A protein has these predicted regions:
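C-terminal motif of bacterial Sec signal peptides marking the signal peptidase cleavage site
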Residues: 20-23
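Bacterial signal peptide processing site
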Residues: 25-28
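Repeated scaffold domains used in trafficking and secretory/extracellular systems
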Residues: 36-41, 73-86, 110-125, 155-172, ...
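Short beta-strand elements that form the blades of beta-propeller/WD-repeat-like
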Residues: 44-53, 80-97, 119-138, 166-181, ...
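A short beta-strand motif characteristic of beta-propeller blades
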Residues: 63-72, 100-115, 145-159, 195-202, ...
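Long, acidic/polar, low-complexity amphipathic helices and coiled-coil-like
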Residues: 101-221
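Acidic, serine/threonine- and glycine-rich low-complexity intrinsically disordered segments
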Residues: 182-301
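Blade-level signature of beta-propeller repeat domains, shared across WD40, Kelch, NHL, RCC1
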Residues: 364-395
Length: 395
């Protein structure tokens, strides 16, 4: 596989740079929450499951899958892990609404966004990206440790133009974010009233998705391969096909190997995919592995789990276990009935999320959610909901 390395200067001006000082942060001190802290809030319940359905969201117990509570919302919402063990960011037309899964309560706290997009949590910071303005809002991941009385202080960075982008803050405070023309990414260091550029690459057309692997290596998907940021430099990986799109990275912060989705036909109908990308960030190698015909999946159907293995919830109804080091499928666990790919990406179809050794799998055709022990393949609990599950998130 071809790879090339490049470092490019970045001279574009930055619009809407926010001061980092607390007094100039964009968070408001005004109390806008309908959920106040109570004595019971000190006994935080972590790891609950949020399941979106048409017109609302349910909170499930992670062991029994019992529905703890349900909350009305908009017709279509998305769910994003905030990173603190209890909060889920619910994507609505108003922005990012905070769901407290511990209480539980769908609070009135909303980080306003014109087009709420990706949410990335890493090393104590959570970044909310507004596609409609190109603004990254940086929030301390533990901001709601004492309750949801008010929106916390934030820091913001706004790109030159609105775009469907994503950002991450590294352990040293460095912000890595997509370029506004979606041609690549830039790494920035924050100062009191500006951001200094560390590195930039414009070698990633159609940049989409983000993941952080071992040694804090950040990977992005491109329409011609992938883009890696590590040790202050960008490295580009070129796909074997002229159009070879990786749109999502499935990573483990203890593994040097990234598993990505892969599409090589821009005109293909539907959303089912039949190959994966394997990127070894240590060896800096890139490989595309074709899967058996029956192993087809969408962007919701791959997760990393025990042993840093990859788990693919395929359209044949099984979870297929993939060894990233070899690209081989080593096992398969029947979980749901066989299913067809969605007509639109927003349509409800099976999804998988993993916490420790347990995979949580939605089965929209049966209005069900299943918990699967990935070390044995055993379904340890199931629940039938009153609604059709769509997206799922682990708090």
């Amino acid at each position: 596989m071809t790879q090339h390395k490049r470092r490019v200067a970045f001279a574009a001006t930055v619009a809407g740079i926010a001061l980092l000082a607390a007094g100039c942060a964009s968070g408001t001190a005004e109390d806008t929450s309908g959920s106040t802290t109570t004595e019971s809030a000190t006994e935080t319940v972590e790891g609950r499951i949020a399941v979106a359905y048409e017109g609302g969201v349910a909170v499930l117990d992670p062991e029994t899958l019992e529905v703890v509570d349900e909350f009305a919302s908009e017709e279509f919402i998305r769910l994003n892990t905030f990173g603190d063990g209890k909060t889920v960011a619910v994507t609505t037309s108003a922005g990012f609404q905070m769901l407290d899964t511990s209480e539980p309560a769908l609070t009135d706290l909303v980080f306003e966004a014109t087009t709420a997009g990706h949410v990335v949590s890493h090393e104590g910071n959570t970044v909310l990206f507004d596609d409609g303005t190109g603004t990254s809002t940086i929030v301390a991941t533990d901001a709601f440790a004492d309750g949801y009385d008010a929106l916390p202080e934030t820091t913001t960075y706004t790109a030159d133009e609105p775009h469907h982008g994503v950002s991450i803050v590294l352990e040293d405070g460095e912000l890595v974010t997509t370029l506004s023309d979606r041609s690549g990414a830039v790494a920035l260091h924050a100062h009191e009233d500006h951001w200094d550029e560390e590195a930039m690459s414009a070698d990633c057309p159609g940049i989409h998705g983000e993941g952080t692997a071992a040694d804090e290596a950040v990977i992005f998907g491109c329409e011609n391969g992938a883009l890696l940021y590590a040790d202050g430099e960008f490295v580009s990986f070129t796909a074997p096909d002229e159009y070879g799109r990786m749109g999502n990275a499935f990573v483990s912060e203890t593994s040097p190997i990234v598993v990505g989705d892969y599409k090589n036909d821009p005109d293909a109908e539907g959303y089912l995919l039949n190959a994966v990308t394997l990127i070894d960030i240590a060896a800096q190698t890139y490989e595309v592995v074709d899967l058996p015909d029956e192993v087809q999946y969408t962007f919701r159907d791959i997760a990393r789990g025990p042993g840093d293995l990859a788990y693919i919830l395929a359209s044949d109804g099984q979870i297929h276990v993939l060894a990233p080091e070899t690209g081989e499928l080593t096992d398969a666990y029947p979980v749901v009935e066989a299913w067809e790919g969605p007509v639109e990406w927003q349509d409800a179809h099976p999804a998988i999320k993993v916490a420790d050794d347990i995979a949580y799998v939605t089965e929209p055709a049966a209005n069900s959610v299943h918990a699967v022990d990935l070390t044995t393949g055993e379904i340890v609990s199931s629940v039938e909901l009153d609604h059709t599950p769509n997206e799922i998130a682990i708090s």
